[in-house]
């Protein structure tokens, strides 16, 4: 079972002082052990001295009686010092162990909180990135070439719409393709017909199209889960869609749907690999983006195949960290959204394996 989830304010700036405290605690443990061992050696010498004195006093007979009394006192003192030494060792060991445990707990909390901050950083960057996609699709759905083609489909209007979409793609390289569809889900034109021959393709059953066909205004948008797009040669995409409306007006009559296919894999990989993990931690630390279905949709350890899952023990918290029984620390942060983009229930996750 994982240990309890913790959450709290950033404490990354305390990491150095905690590290110094751990070092001081270890130095104290070593110093105390050396001093106690020294006392025990002196006590042993006193006991040996007392024993030798008792032997010599016995040999001296009547003349050694006084010395015998002194030897007995020395032996008693040695015994008392030995007892005090043992008690001191037990008490110091217990206190140093407690201090060490508290210090390690503070270090773990600081590390966990920093990991949560990194998880937030990853999900915030992708949220801001995808927010821009929602703006793009709603804007481009009002382009006159797109509106004209959706309203009156001819070979000429489709060719011009395709050309216009191609111009947009040349400026926005994060997209694989842009598709203009009619209200029945048929692709009318796309921006890269030389690369993707999708004109006439039926996308009526695609989740993003089903959502987009139900939109009530041009101010709204639809989005599908990260998926592999057969029409785009099996590339992983994040597809955003908006309704194309008469006159490019927000509440004009619906004419069709514009879908924009964000080139997911390379963009997501750049984000997760860009999270600032300390060099000495990189070999045992993974940065993940996990969707609402707990699918791993991006990983710093390699391109995700979208068929792996990672269960997060959130404890109904938006963020936090916990330690598994094998010593692995998991930190997470739910999508906070950005501006009008509420996010899709994703999480940024940092996984740090134990030594």
Language model feature labels by segment:
Residues 161-171, 257-305, 314:
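Solvent-exposed, extracytoplasmic
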Residues 190-261, 321-323:
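Extracytoplasmic/periplasmic ligand-binding sensor regions of membrane-associated signaling proteins
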Residues 43-88:
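EAAAR-patterned alpha-helical heptad-repeat segments
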Residues 109-218, 272:
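Extracytoplasmic/periplasmic sensory segments of membrane signal-transduction proteins
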Residues 27-55, 87-97:
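Alpha-helical coiled-coil
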Residues 308-355:
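Extracellular/periplasmic juxtamembrane segments that couple receptor/chemosensory ectodomains to their
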Residues 3-26, 106-109:
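Short, charge-rich amphipathic alpha-helices with coiled-coil/heptad character
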Residues 52, 180-194, 249-250, 285-297:
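Short, glycine-anchored, charge-dense loop/turn motifs used at functional sites
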